[in-house]
């Protein structure tokens, strides 16, 4: 048991030393940073600390790596950046943590206290900069308050709906000495459902004829997934996962019906619309899973919703639930052991049909795209050779459909994908995942435009010996935007074409392994060589530009749009 020092016997330490000790106290084992002179005292204190420091090439990448670790562990990912441009560069990662409900703490250097308010070199008001995307923004002006405010930062990042906290550190505060006790390690509070609420849920399920469940959000665990899987199996309950949350339910289970993402299976939507009870656990039913807020009426849904969420403010925020349950997914799923059907449920065929529809939708066999490289066969090969616990990472772009539709997620903490749709996330997320669990295989899917948003972090993977594999789909364009152009302004291509480097040579220039893949037959041996190389690898896959989605072409979209004019 940790016994904190008392103020009377605490040694005098600098603010930087006190801060690093608080990180250790709260269980931090790794952090990500781009160094800056504004927090040199912290860097010096880290020299002697048992914390693995990953030095990154750009603050956005560092923040995304920290967010990825927060997403995988449920503990705050830690990132340090310098003031001004360092902070603004990191903002993309903070925004991801906000929309993904990921615990994260961004520490930002700040100008000396005496210079505040004078627009000093690289000075920013971090409350104004991050106020709309962080749960809390605080500046620590007194080293004696470091334990108090860091403890609060960990609590804020993990409680209720998790999210990012931003802590500003004036450089002279970090060098000032103080005698202060360390805080006790933070603990995450679980909000539990009441027995009466669980009895009401059982009654609602018992009366339903076609219920469904939708899983999303954060504050899940491997145990919680197992518990909900057992519950769904007992009730033969069709289960759907929210946008980029497929890791919350095993895709090979007979109750799994697919995910509510982009380009969703129309049969899936029809089943949810026809349901007479919707159990939502952890998610918020935000824009993408709600299909542009069209799947459920606001504020009074046609389908009765039982909404379970860790944050009371999310219950009834958009949709008036028939039954709100204020509980974390972990506490709620533990209570589900007592919720079992009194008799055989009448909708088992409904669940079987939903799973059959998912299997047909995710079948790679009928998928044919223009060009010599058939991505359906590529996905089938990945399913054949990769371990089930492979961590898949992606940023934003049409390329991500290949993962979300065709990879069967069966393992918790195996998916790193931003619900915010942030481009460039996949590579730094892969670095963060591999740094956390080096024994796990990590595969990054990226587009050509997406990859170069944070492609420099390939150097970070090389520096730390992290053999991630990047499957880079190159169609020489910002494909998603081009797709929308053809739908809205057919034939009028504007600002979406790209001239790309040789990504095989790019990987090799950094000291990694590179392959160029132009045909289906070349992919399997290229992947095998990459896996055997022991190096960070890029498989530069050249895709026919017409193959804009697994089932659609640019020409087809253009023709359809022109026919409507």
Question: What does each model-identified segment do?
Answer:
Residues 29-33, 52-54, 72-111, 214-217, ...:
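A short, small-residue-rich loop immediately preceding and capping a beta-strand
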Residues 17-28, 68-74, 98, 156-161, ...:
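Glycine-rich phosphate/diphosphate-binding loops that line cofactor/substrate pockets in enzymes
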Residues 71, 218-306, 408-431, 435-440, ...:
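Glycine-rich, anion-gripping cofactor-binding loops and their flanking helix/strand elements
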Residues 107, 115-122, 269-272, 316-318, ...:
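Thiamine diphosphate
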Residues 108-149, 171, 245-353:
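Glycine-rich, acidic loop regions that bind phosphate or pyrophosphate groups
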Residues 140, 152, 156-207, 362:
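Conformationally flexible catalytic loops at phosphate/diphosphate-handling active centers
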Residues 19-20, 34-37, 42-43, 47, ...:
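Active-site diphosphate/adenylate-binding microenvironment
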Residues 2-10, 144, 180-181, 203, ...:
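Phosphate/pyrophosphate-binding active-site segments
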């Amino acid at each position: 048991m940790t016994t904190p020092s008392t103020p009377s016997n605490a040694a005098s330490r600098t603010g930087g030393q006190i801060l690093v000790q608080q990180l250790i106290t709260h269980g931090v084992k790794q952090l990500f940073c781009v160094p800056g002179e504004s927090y040199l005292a912290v860097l010096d204190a880290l020299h002697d600390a048992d914390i693995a420091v990953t030095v990154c090439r750009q603050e956005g990448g560092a923040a995304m790596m920290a967010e990825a670790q927060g997403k995988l562990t449920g503990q705050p990912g830690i990132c340090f950046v310098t003031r001004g441009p360092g902070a603004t560069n990191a903002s993309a990662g903070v925004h991801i943590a906000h929309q993904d409900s990921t615990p994260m703490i961004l520490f930002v250097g700040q100008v000396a206290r005496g210079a505040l308010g004078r627009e000093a070199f690289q000075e920013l008001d971090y409350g104004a900069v991050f106020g709309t995307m962080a749960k809390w923004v605080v500046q620590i002006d007194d080293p004696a308050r470091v334990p108090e405010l860091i403890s609060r930062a960990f609590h804020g990042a993990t409680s209720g709906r998790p999210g990012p906290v931003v802590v500003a550190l004036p450089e002279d505060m970090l060098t000032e000495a103080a005698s202060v006790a360390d805080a006790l390690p933070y603990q995450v509070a679980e909000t539990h459902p009441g027995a009466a609420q669980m009895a009401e849920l059982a009654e609602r399920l018992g009366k339903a004829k076609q219920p469904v469940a939708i899983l999303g959000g954060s504050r899940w665990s491997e145990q919680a997934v197992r518990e909900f899987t057992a519950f769904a199996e007992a009730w033969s309950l069709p289960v759907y996962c929210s946008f980029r949350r497929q890791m919350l339910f095993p895709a090979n289970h007979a109750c799994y019906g697919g995910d509510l993402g982009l380009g969703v299976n129309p049969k899936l939507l029809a089943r949810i619309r026809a349901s007479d009870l919707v159990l939502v656990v952890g998610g918020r039913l935000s824009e993408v899973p709600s299909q542009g807020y069209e799947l459920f009426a606001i504020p009074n849904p046609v389908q009765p919703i039982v909404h379970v969420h860790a944050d009371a403010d999310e219950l009834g925020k958009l949709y008036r639930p028939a039954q709100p349950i204020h509980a974390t997914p972990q506490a709620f799923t533990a209570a589900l052991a007592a919720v079992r059907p009194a008799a055989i449920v009448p909708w088992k065929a409904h669940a079987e049909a939903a799973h059959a529809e998912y299997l047909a939708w995710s079948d790679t066999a009928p998928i044919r795209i223009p060009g010599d490289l058939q991505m359906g066969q590529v996905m089938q090969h990945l399913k054949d050779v990769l371990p089930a616990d492979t961590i898949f990472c992606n940023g934003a772009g049409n390329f991500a459909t290949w993962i979300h539709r065709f990879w069967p997620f069966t393992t918790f903490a195996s998916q790193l994908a931003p619900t915010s749709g942030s481009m460039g996330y996949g590579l730094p997320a892969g670095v963060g995942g591999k740094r956390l669990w080096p024994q796990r295989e990590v595969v990054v899917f990226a587009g050509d435009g997406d990859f170069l948003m944070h492609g420099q972090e390939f150097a970070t993977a090389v520096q730390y010996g992290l053999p991630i594999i990047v499957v880079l789909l190159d169609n020489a364009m910002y494909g998603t935007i081009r797709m929308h152009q053809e739908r809205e302004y057919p034939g009028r291509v504007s600002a979406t074409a790209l001239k790309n480097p040789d990504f095989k040579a790019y990987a090799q220039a950094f000291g990694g392994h590179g392959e160029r893949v132009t045909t289906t037959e070349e992919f399997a041996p290229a992947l095998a060589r990459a896996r055997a190389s022991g190096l960070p690898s890029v498989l530069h896959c050249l895709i026919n530009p017409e193959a804009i989605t697994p089932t659609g072409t640019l020409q087809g979209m253009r023709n359809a749009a022109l026919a409507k004019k």
